Amino acid sequence: WPSDKFMLGLVSFLIGHVFYISGLISGIEFSLSWQVWVPLIILGSGMFLGLRSGLGRMQLPVLLYILVILIMSGTAWERHFQLELPQTYFAVWGAALFILSDALLAWNRFRVKFKSAQLFILGTYYTAQWALAISLSQSAAEQVS
């Protein structure tokens, strides 16, 4: 195992986002509504361009990860717009907090280290996981009953 496990973590989280996409897309039609995807493309482009000079050999893996997390977020928004259920707000907030958590992590790793980074990264990360899990567990419970 390499001493720096960042790449292993990146791949693990990428796989996790694929599972979230699978859960979020169930029961809806995937669509490419511009209201969802144009802002996400702008956000993702800005994130990548802001990080690019510090990425070195990690440019392609980070770009792929950004694409997957944006697809997860877009799917959460599409779910919210199509189902209009209260729990879909949790999916949207969870996705937004996941993007924030990962942006803070990436900025801290590849650009500038900042004080209290772990507090902000983990605080947004755990809240994101909770919100996404709540949004999907409520949906699953309603589909069963």
Region roles according to the model:
Residues 1-145:
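Polytopic alpha-helical membrane-helix bundles and their juxtamembrane interface segments
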